[in-house]
Amino acid sequence: MGQSTSAAGNSILNRRRSKSFTLKFPIESIESEISQPDYTSSLPDECLALVFQFLNSGNRKRCALVCRRWMIVEGQNRYRLSLHARSDLITSIPSLFSRFDSVTKLSLKCDRRSVSIGDEALVKISLRCRNLKRLKLRACRELTDVGMAAFAENCKDLKIFSCGSCDFGAKGVKAVLDHCSNLEELSIKRLRGFTDIAPEMIGPGVAASSLKSICLKELYNGQCFGPVIVGAKNLKSLKLFRCSGDWDLLLQEMSGKDHGVVEIHLERMQVSDVALSAISYCSSLESLHLVKTPECTNFGLAAIAEKCKRLRKLHIDGWKANLIGDEGLVAVAKFCSQLQELVLIGVNPTTLSLGMLAAKCLNLERLALCGCDTFGDPELSCIAAKCPALRKLCIKNCPISDVGIENLANGCPGLTKVKIKKCKGVLGGCADWLRTVRPMLSVNADTMEQEHEEAASNDVVGGSQENGIEFPQLNSQIMASSIASSSRNRSGYFKSGIGLFSGMSLVPCTSRQRRASR
C-alpha cells in the first residue's frame, strides 16, 4: 500500500511539474523564435567586417563563435595580431595563419622563463604573411641571423621593424635593411652580438631612401649603425637611449648632410657641445630632448637655438649639473619664438630667463619645472604675469609657497590645468582655494599628508620615476605615417553601445523586435 501511494503521488507531482514547465516555456514560442529569419544574413561581408572593426579583441573573438560565416569574415579582416612567441607556437602556425590570412601587423613576444620560437617558426610565418607591414619582436632569444635573413627575403614590403631583447646580431638587422626597400621605422633595443662587428658592415641598404625614423636603445656598440644613420636620406627622427661610446663624431657626420631631421632625442649619451654644435645645422629641427647629458652646456644649447629657429618642443634634464641655465635659456627665448613646450628638470632658471621666454615665446602653451632650486615665488609670479597663452603648468619639487599660488590665480588667463607636486611650501588648503577662485581650472595638487605617503611609497619602490613628466605630443608630422590600425579609429560612442551586444545572440534580439512591432 505504501508503494502504490508513493507511486501515485509521484505521478501527480510529475504532471504538475510538466504542466508548470509547459506554461512557463511553451514549445511553440521556442520553435517560432528558431524559425525566424536571420536578418544579418543579408548584410554584406564588407559591412559586417566594418562592424567588427569597432570592437575590441575580446568582443571580436566572441563574435567569431556565433557562426561559421562570422568567423571567416572576422579572420579575413583582422590585420593586427599579437602572439605569445613560445616554442610550441610552431605547431599552430598553419591553422592560425590560414584563418588570419590578412595580417599586416604582427607582434611576437616571449617571456623570460619560456623558450621562444626559432628560425623555423619565423620562416613559416613569413611564408604565410607576404604582405606584412609591421613586425615587433620581444625576447625571442632563439632567433638567429639566418632566420632573420630568410624572413627579410620573404617579407620585402615591411615598413616598421622593432626588436628588443633578442640574441641575433648585426647580420640579421642588415638583412632587413638590404631587402626591405619600404622600411620607414627601425627600432633596435638591447640586442647582443655587436661587439666584433665593424661599423661599415651595417649600411642603410635598399632602405636608404625610405627610412625616416631610427631608435637605438641600450646597445653596447651602437656606433655600428652609424652608416645607417648617415646614409638615411630622408631621416626625420633620431632617438638614442643609453648607448655606450662617444657619439660626437657620428652626429657631426650626420648633421653635415642635413636630411631634414625634425626630432632628436638624446638620453644618457656621451655627447658634448661638439655634438650640439653639429646638431645646430639641422635647420628643420622642431623637437629636442637632452636628458642627463652632463657634458652639454649653455654654449651648445645657444648654438642650437641660434640656428634651429623652428624649435617648438624642448626638454632638458640637467641632472643637477648646473651647466645649463639662464644663458642658454635666454638664447632659446631670443631665437626660438615658435616654442610651444618647455620642460626643465634639474635646471635652475631665474626671472631673467623666464621673463625673456614669456616675452619672446608668445606661443608657449606647456611649461614644466621639476627639481629647479631657483624656481620660487618670484619666478612663478613672473610666469603668471607674462604668459597669457600658457595652458598647462606642472611644478614639482620646487621652492614655491602659497604666495606664488595666489599670484598664479590672478594671471595666466588661458590656463586650463595645473599640477603641483612635492612643493613643501604649498599647503593643501591653498590648492582648494585655487579651485574655488578658478572653477574652470583643473588643479592636481598633493597635501602635506599625501606628500609624506608618496615619499614612503617611493622609498619602498625605489623612486625611479621621481622626475617623470608627460605632455601630449605636438600635432606635427615628426614621425613617419604608419598604416592606420582599425583599433585606433574606433568611435567611442559606437564602441560603448556595441559593447552591450557582447556575449549575446543577435538573431533572437531581431526576432523579438519584430514580434513586438506586431
UniProtKB/Swiss-Prot annotation:
Disulfide bonds: none annotated. It holds the Pfam family LRR_6. Coiled coil: none annotated. One of its GO terms (molecular function) is ubiquitin-protein transferase activity. Residues 37-82 form the F-box domain. Gene3D superfamilies: 1.20.1280.50, Ribonuclease Inhibitor. This is F-box protein At1g47056.
